[in-house]
Amino acid sequence: MPTASRHPDTALAVFLAFLKLGCSAFGGPIAHLGYFRDEFVRRRGWLSESSYADLVALCQFLPGPASSQVGMALGLARAGYPGARAAGLGFTLPSALLLVLFALGLGRWGALLPEGVLHGLKIAAVAVVAQAVWGMGRSLCPDRPRLTLMALSCASVLAWPTAWTQVAVIAGAGLAGRALLKTEAVEGHERLPIAIGYRGALLFLTLFAVLLVCLPLAARLWPEQWLRLLDAFYRAGSLVFGGGHVVLPLLQAEVVPKGWVDGDTFLAGYAAAQAVPGPLFTFAAFLGAASGPAPNGWSGALLCLLAIFLPSFLLVAGALPFWERLRHERRVRATLAGVNAAVVGLLLAALYQPLWTEGILRPADFALLLFALLALLAWKTPPWQVVLACAVAGGLIATAG
């Protein structure tokens, strides 16, 4: 393995490195982190194994898409703030473009699709989220206290299905975890290879908090659609713990009840997001393109994409200087453990409503779901292949029926 290289790169070099991964990194956030390790630790030698492990730990602690945040942190280490932006752009651009094109095509030619294809995509979404619930539950809810937090969180958001209920559940689970859970402190490693002053970090954290508080107020005072979209997607990007799939219930609660995107289109787009490389958060580009009223299309996609990723950039840049101290605190890690248990509950609730209730309507749907789960869990089939197979099978079932 090459030794860690401290020589800076240009933002263009960072962009091209992440663009390659954005075109090829299938498999979700855990797989993305493996791709990053192979490319930037083992092959390029940008940083050491221990420094990379620390970056991953930080980004799993923060809300937002962990793999995208690790990418931004790597870009920040190599080329400063322009490098962080270049890494984020390169990694998200391919999947965002594909999903926008899918949204535009669905709006224009969706009626021409064979009957049952969109329903097959819904069934694929059920299978993919069920796989995520199973894997995250085994990892993040290993004991009775965390299983209890998970169950209470799921029941709460099903009983009171609003975005603010989800926020309250996450906050309450964090407090409960801090009070009830016991975790081990992390032993020290070498310092992360990123130099950011505390003053600059506080500026980024302040901007993050100001936007989180002020955007909902602004959207109420000036009910312009672009401001509502900015608020909804910024808030979703600020409050998602546990990875890309957890954004599903937050975004569904924001866009479907308000009529910006109908339920069938939402689930079809979510399934399509499983079939493209890169971060699942680029689902925001699909929703922005498919939403109504304006802005939508390309401008709506760009607005929603920037809004959902902006919190990640602000948090990574703001948290890095403080992470060396915080990662040793048992109480901080216990708080995070409680939050992680809650997000499994949120995802379980989303698996039932809307995914199961709108996707599994007849025995044939359940049979197709079983085969999709078998492919994902037993045969380890890539999700994009399962999505395509379910779309084809849905069309065939509708034709035969």
Regions found by a protein language model. Give the residues of each.
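Conserved beta-loop-alpha segment that forms the PLP phosphate-binding cup at the N-terminus of a helix
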Residues: 66-69
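Multi-pass membrane proteins that catalyze or facilitate reactions on polyprenyl-/lipid-phosphate substrates
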Residues: 1-62, 73-276, 280-401
